[in-house]
Amino acid sequence: MTITPQQLIALLPLLIVGLTVVVVMLSIAWRRNHFVNATLAVVGLNLALFSLYFVGQAGPMDVTPLLRIDAYSMFYTGLVILASLATCTFAYPWLATYPDNREEFYLLVLIAALGGVVLASASHLASLFIGIELISLPLFGLVGYAFQQKRSLEAAIKYTILSAAASSFLLFGMALVYADSGNLGFMALGRSLNDDVIHQPLLLAGLGLMIVGFGFKLSLVPFHLWTPDVYQGAPAPVSTFLATASKIAIFGVLMRLFMYAPMANSEGVRTVLGIIAVASMLFGNLMAISQSNIKRLLGYSSIAHLGYLLVALIAVQSQQLSVETVGVYLAGYLFSSLGAFGVVSLMSSPYRGPDAESLYSYRGLFWHRPILAAVMTVMMLSLAGIPMTLGFIGKFYVIAVGVNAHLWWLTGAVVLGSAIGLYYYLRMTVSLYLSPPELMQRDSPANWAFTAGGVVVLISAILVLVLGIYPQPLISLVNLAQPLH
């Protein structure tokens, strides 16, 4: 098979990230230098981001049967690379005083980013599985990166075992789907799916097993049990990556699969997904209420956010609006999560053992770091879906999709879940403005706003506010990113 120059241009982000992985690996082998390797990783990711401009010029195309490069894949590639860049930026000051090998961190983040880019373009179950494994395997190492602490090691072991189990479910599900349909391409699957999936027991069993695998990767109830422990045990920059890049890439490819192969047309599949969505919304929010650890709280809240997003997946028949909803919601979720985890990373840097993760550490933050407290407030309000923030635009879209598709019970659950969520987000926000404790346990550096991580956090806060008040640029961008058949 010959690859034309056009196809090479279409694959630029993938090739650049892959090349950066090799360069960083050789650089580590030659000489360990934290600054040099961090710079190489960030430069490589920035080049991959800029290369999207040339990919856009090349136009939509199928590069091999495994990958479809179009505006949709470019949008999700961009989000994954932004999340990876933020992870590297937050990790640099944290790793500066880390007592063990530091350089491999960037290597693992780059390999996971490569997996995310593969997922964004996947149009075949084989590339979907390769992408998911590429994103999951480095995370085993990243979650346990602070292995001197028992909690980080425990989180890594939990994540490794459960992730391996989920991958085997996913693979077995794909095998059954292949046994029934004889195809692994998304489009070909769509052609072999009849409206009466119920009468195709092999296909139904395969879809069920795949939903279990995806449910674990997206931490949906009842496959969510690892989430709070792993978010708490992983270093703050890794929790950032887990909450953003891996969720966004996997949900992006799941959305494409459901559009090309309309599984949600089957009443049985819709009912199962609906039950998972409602359980995730309510359970995620109810469990977050009792948390006194901010990383656990954000872990439970991510379960609820993915539950809201499932509404758009179930209503995938009203395609245009559904795809628009997922794009806007995930962009809002990305910037809100980057800001929230960014503040935790800034408070936890440089490395001093456990992260600054108890809510008590943030009590009275406003009185000595007012701008940082204001940023955290904006992020909490956005995650809660308060008007004037980007989070509100996403929630509004989700409810609009639910109403449009007549999914009344799901729309009711979104409203109820958001109301419960308001309580713990506001509890976190209020504690920032209480009188500070006599002795400050943890604090961010005084010049945090002039560090690279501080700049990322401030840009996220500005984007959340500006796009919350005037969302048209984002909506136009998401409309451009409609997948072409």
From Swiss-Prot:
It catalyses: a quinone + NADH + 5 H(+)(in) = a quinol + NAD(+) + 4 H(+)(out). The chain crosses the membrane at residues 8-28, 35-55, 75-95, 105-125, 127-147, 159-179, 203-223, 235-255, 271-291, 297-317, 326-346, 373-393, 408-427, 449-469. GO terms for biological process: ATP synthesis coupled electron transport. It is an enzyme of class 7 (translocase). Signal peptide: none annotated. It is a multi-pass membrane protein. It is found in: Cell inner membrane. Its EC number is 7.1.1.-. It holds the Pfam family Proton_antipo_M. InterPro entries: NADH-Q_OxRdtase_suN/2 (IPR010096), ND/Mrp_TM (IPR001750). GO terms for cellular component: plasma membrane. The keyword Membrane applies. The keyword Nuclease does not apply. GO terms for molecular function: NADH dehydrogenase (ubiquinone) activity; NADH:ubiquinone reductase (non-electrogenic) activity; quinone binding. Keywords: Cell inner membrane, Cell membrane, Membrane, NAD, Quinone, Translocase, Transmembrane, Transmembrane helix, Transport, Ubiquinone. Belongs to the complex I subunit 2 family. NDH-1 is composed of 13 different subunits. Subunits NuoA, H, J, K, L, M, N constitute the membrane sector of the complex. NDH-1 shuttles electrons from NADH, via FMN and iron-sulfur (Fe-S) centers, to quinones in the respiratory chain. The immediate electron acceptor for the enzyme in this species is believed to be ubiquinone. Couples the redox reaction to proton translocation (for every two electrons transferred, four hydrogen ions are translocated across the cytoplasmic membrane), and thus conserves the redox energy in a proton gradient. This is NADH-quinone oxidoreductase subunit N. It comes from Erwinia tasmaniensis (strain DSM 17950 / CFBP 7177 / CIP 109463 / NCPPB 4357 / Et1/99). The gene is nuoN.
